[in-house]
Amino acid sequence: MANSKAVTCQIRYTLNLNKLSAFESYARTWMMLIERYGGTHHGYFLPRAAPDGAEISFPGLGNDGPGDVAVAMFTFPDEQSYRRYRQMVKTAPERQSAAALVRETRCFTRYERLFLKPVQRA
């Protein structure tokens, strides 16, 4: 029986900060592709300076992260929808263009993905 739980994925990119406009173009392409194939894209988030006076809530436990990391997050309604997207996006011309952009510009140097589930409210 297929799992009907939503599939939420967070992707963290290590950016080449000299190629931000190329990365933004890449990001816009993937937002469109995710939504074309039935997902909800929650956006790409680029690094920025911390607000003045922003302190770590738990000194000794936390620290500010690196300034070259971008984050994206998207959700598909269920695993079947996610698998269908993965199959269909393989042949999308825009995916091929986005892959070529990354190869040509090296707008990011690595990425990692996390599959997540929400904490239910009490």
Show which residues each predicted segment covers.
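An amphipathic, aromatic/His-enriched active-site/gating alpha helix that lines ligand/cofactor pockets
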Residues: 2, 25-42, 59-69, 73-113
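Basic/polar N-terminal segments that are highly enriched at the extreme N-terminus
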Residues: 1-3, 121-122
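Short, surface-exposed ligand-recognition loops at beta-strand->loop->(often short) alpha-helix junctions
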Residues: 16-23
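Active-site-flanking beta-strand signature of metal-NTP-handling nucleotidyl enzymes
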Residues: 7-14, 71
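Feature marks short, surface-exposed loop/turn motifs that line or immediately flank catalytic pockets
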Residues: 17, 48, 78-80
